[in-house]
């Protein structure tokens, strides 16, 4: 199973490092056939919140098939306005088994039209999609 974690400039470090650690530990202990990787729009280093720099394993153009896509939260204002990012998320949503988010990553899923009608309560607020 291929688990891709989408990262971008100003992504929240815990939002991608936490899932990466959990799934890579599960792989080490039980799920040897899992492949966990970070994906960014390009292969260039990404500067997450707090100046934390990370090198994605893949870009939009060279990643393997994704079974599970995790879209992380962070300062996503610029991502919400990138047509190529939204198109990529929407495309992966049509081919992946699961597309999920951490925290405010849900806004990218909503903007990419990957959510049906749902009610969410991230960070104590209520949003209708």
Where are these regions (language model features)?
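A conserved active-site-flanking secondary-structure segment within enzyme catalytic domains
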Residues: 115-129
